[in-house]
Amino acid sequence: MWASLLVLVPISSFPPLAGIAGGSGSVVAPLAAVPALLLLGLWVVPQWLKGDRLPPWSGPLFAFVGIAILASAGSVFLDLHPFLGQAVIGRSVRALATLAVGLTFFFTSAAYPTTEARLRASMRWLAVGAVGMLLWSTVQAALSPGDAQIPWQLRDFHRLFSVRDLNPDRVTGFAYEPSWLANQLVVLYLPLWLGAVLAGSSAFRKIRGRFPIEAFLLGWGLLILVLTKSRIGILSALTVAAILGAAATWRLGRRLRLPRGRGKIAGLGRGRTFSIGVRLALLVVLVGVLVGGVYLLGRFDPRVARVFTVRPVLSAGGWGAVYSYTNQLAYAERVMYWVSGLKAFSLHPLLGVGLGNAGFLFRQSLPVFGYALPEMIVILNGAPGFPNPKSLWVRLLAETGVGGFLLFTIWLFGIGLAAYRLSRGRASFLRVVGAAGLFALAAQVTEGFSLDSFALPQLWIMLGLVTAGTSISSALSRPADGKDYTPSFHPS
């Protein structure tokens, strides 16, 4: 069951599950949830009942769940009227169910890999599912280029795995839409493969003893990421690249020194000015490379090409200039969802409006600018679906308030701290997991402005693997007989 869970991660909107979850209006239906729920009920929970410890850093997570339940229960007393045919209780129940699915992914991923061998096997099974996803994405790119009509064979095959048809000029993999595929790549697969390459430790046998398979998968995955044309996904990858570049620049600057007897400048000491100069020069080069990368992407995506066109929208002034600029980038609709969610938070800052309920305030919270946007007009005229904040960070604020937001971010910080410790440890493969966790969290900072669902498995699994690695590291550091040999001193 564990292997099937990992292999099925790329399938995010399985049609039969979507029908069970809520019909055509439900798009988040990960097939991996089926083995995850079975594994939780048949193995994880029984292990807890036998006395196994809960995963590290579970306290803030359980506290967040308590806040979410309390906020959702209290939402029935708020002035939230039915909107687009949906009521508060139904929305809250469905939202809590998606959170339960996400927690299932986390706890199974944190509990099942109890040894380094299981952790390695987990990475191999993840790669099996990823190869299938990458192959299908490559087929999409090869057989449906540009604006050409999608062959019916591809369309019918894709409908077996997703409730949404393929996009003619963007790859989707097995996901609901290209941005979901990009999210899978930048918060799960690419971090693991990049971590393996940088740590020099592979879950597979190296090709000819030197070339890790993860390096090949990393290059393939980056190519597919570009073909998704997901701006947030690509920006997330660039964020990780910028952090790595800055860290490498800092370390290189520390190592570089002028030969002895040179570079002595009053008050700075030997070579310090030279080191600082090298760092600044490398940072300038890094910024230039990133800007050049954005410009190059703009040659393939007209939306990105307008990033540097600022002057025409400045005349609007104030927030109007911001909205006009985002509209120029074809991103204004997303910003409208964010602003609406933040206004809901301002009305209910302590506990929010309860999970799933931010959309009930959408009509009264939508900025005037939004009433001219086609997507907003369609929603206000009663289109199927329900408006969500479209950002995990905004959703946490709007639906769980300050308390829920702080608890969730504290939990993420704890996982990040655990990942950092793993990345600095002695066990080479645990360093892979630790580095991957850091890369995934860095990407999630940006990705949190794109997706807001709790039910998608990729982030939960990544955080669960980091937690499992922490437990394995703790077990390896204990004596074989489990006794504590730390000396204690008592006054005589």
Describe the role of every protein-language-model region.
Residues V65-I69, L99-T108, R120-P168, T172-A266, ...:
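Alpha-helical transmembrane segments of multi-pass inner-membrane proteins
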Residues M1-H81, T114-R120, R124, Q149-Q153, ...:
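Transmembrane signal-anchor hairpin modules in multi-pass inner-membrane enzymes, especially those
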